[in-house]
Design a protein with these regions (language model features):
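Conserved class I S-adenosyl-L-methionine
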Residues: 1-37, 51-55, 73-76, 80, 136-164
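Class I SAM-dependent methyltransferase SAM/SAH-binding core
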Residues: 43-45, 49-96
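A short acidic, Gly/Pro-enriched loop at the edge of an enzyme's catalytic core
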Residues: 97-107
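A short SAM/SAH-binding and catalytic strip from SAM-dependent methyltransferases
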Residues: 105-119
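A short glycine-rich, Lys/Arg-flanked "PGG" loop and its adjoining helix->strand segment in the class I
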Residues: 120-135
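Acceptor-substrate binding/catalytic loop of class I
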Residues: 138-140, 144, 168-183
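Short alpha-helix
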Residues: 175-199
Length: 231
């Protein structure tokens, strides 16, 4: 796991509240795929510092579980939301061993899956814990956007990419997996999911006032992909 989400957890939380990529592109594009959540059971899978949890609690959810591999992030969630959420540390590469079958109406998994090598295993676990008629919404790096980082030059070959990001104000090493759209959709199909929506998101116009250059780039080039799939 990158130091971004452990050592720099508090700084990442502060930045993610309002930066263009999270607040003005990823979150509104993900939320647009959700059905009304009032009285629903929700699993925030890869919850980070609890920014989505804050939104869910305003929607009058019946029960909210927040899990993340970073203990530092989970501590932030507990500090913010206390007993309003069931928050605990869980490495998603190990599945969802603490979660029972058929519990959740909705699962959200924002900007997490590109850090995991084995998508089929996690999708099978997500399918297991969803109620019949439930759904999962997730966002991840767009396959096209990541291909420019490819070392092999083979779009269809999964590969691990290493970059340095300055999200928290200093360079931090981040490693993630680049994979084809086919690999993503086939893993969903194999788990039993049916894809009902697939979008590339829309950057909010407010971003233009913050950084015209970034707004222009995100308006012309895909950065994330957003998928809703049904059980």
């Amino acid at each position: 796991m990158s130091d971004m989400y452990t050592k720099h957890a508090k700084r990442y939380d502060a930045v993610a509240q309002s930066n263009i990529y999270n607040a003005l592109l990823e979150r509104p594009s993900t939320i647009a795929l959700l059905s009304p959540l009032s009285e629903k059971t929700v699993l925030d899978m890869g919850c980070g510092s609890g920014i989505y949890a804050q939104y869910f609690l305003t929607q009058n959810v019946n029960y909210l579980t927040c899990i993340d591999a970073s203990s530092e992030m989970i501590e932030l969630v507990k500090a913010k939301h206390g007993s309003n959420v069931n928050a605990y540390v869980q490495d998603l590469s190990q599945g969802l061993p603490q979660e029972p079958d058929n519990l959740y109406d909705a699962i959200i998994c924002p900007l997490v899956l590109h850090y995991l090598e084995d998508l089929p295993a996690l999708f099978q676990e997500a399918y297991r814990v969803l109620k019949k008629g439930g759904y999962m919404v997730f966002s991840m790096h767009h396959p096209f956007a990541d291909f420019e980082c490819s070392v092999t030059g083979n779009y269809y070959e999964r590969e691990q990419i290493e970059e340095e990001w300055d999200t928290v104000g200093e360079p931090v090493t981040v490693r993630f997996y680049r994979r084809s759209l086919t690999e993503i959709t086939e893993a969903l199909n194999a788990a039993g999911f049916v894809i009902s929506r697939l979008t590339e998101g829309v950057v909010a116009k407010e971003a233009k006032q913050i950084s015209p250059e970034t707004y222009e780039r995100l308006s012309r080039n895909p950065n994330f992909i957003f998928i809703r799939c049904e059980k």
